[in-house]
């Protein structure tokens, strides 16, 4: 008996059980490339968190990204917990795209204050309009939403664990970022913003 073709195994892993699921890969690739290109358009950094201190959120994000990859489930010979079908893939692809577009809305609205790292930019101030009036970290909110949709499309336990790990990493990063910005921008400015606007979930009542 011939061994299973590894390419065929990936094609049946849940991500690519039907051709529309290729749109998920296209969405993420387009988002990643555009995000990397956008990194060249940012304001001058005056202060940043040390790379060593950032390991607390980098590690779960990297681990989660590995778990989310369809090849991980294939290597583990993992079967999907469910299959969403062609229509489901379409819906989840739209939700994934919506989450990615939300991140770009937030990034463009933040303008020159954006950075992939935790930094204070030249002339930095609190931005509390647009998506930043809904949540304090709309980029993370959009990414987590897009990842949840992608994880559901994958339908494997490793994909869902990957989403949870990445979400935890973003939560850790958000907490570190808020401590940094409170110190840099002042408790009166940023602290008041934190008390008024939810961290990641829109419309969540603040204590």
Regions found by a protein language model. Name each.
Residues 1-122, 128, 146-207:
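Membrane-anchoring alpha-helices and their flanking helix-loop junctions
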Residues 124-135, 139-140:
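Solvent-exposed interhelical
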């Amino acid at each position: 008996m011939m061994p299973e073709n590894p390419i065929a195994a990936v094609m049946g892993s849940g991500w690519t059980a039907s051709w529309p699921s290729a749109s998920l890969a296209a969405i993420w690739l387009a988002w990643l490339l555009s995000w990397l290109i956008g990194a060249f358009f940012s304001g001058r950094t005056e202060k940043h968190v040390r790379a060593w201190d950032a390991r607390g959120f980098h590690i779960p994000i990297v681990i989660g990204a590995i778990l989310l990859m369809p090849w991980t489930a294939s290597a583990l010979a993992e079967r999907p917990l469910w299959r969403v079908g062609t229509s489901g893939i379409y819906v989840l692809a739209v939700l994934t795209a919506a989450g990615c577009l939300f991140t770009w809305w937030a990034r463009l609205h933040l303008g020159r204050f954006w950075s992939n790292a935790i930094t204070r930019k030249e002339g930095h101030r609190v931005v509390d309009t647009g998506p930043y009036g809904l949540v304090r970290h709309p980029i993370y909110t959009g990414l987590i939403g897009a990842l949840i949709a992608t994880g559901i499309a994958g339908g494997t336990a490793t994909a869902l664990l990957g989403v949870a790990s990445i979400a935890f990493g973003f939560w850790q990063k958000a907490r570190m970022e808020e401590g940094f910005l409170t110190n840099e921008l002042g408790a009166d400015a940023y602290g008041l913003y934190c008390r008024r606007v939810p961290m990641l979930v829109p419309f969540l009542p603040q204590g």
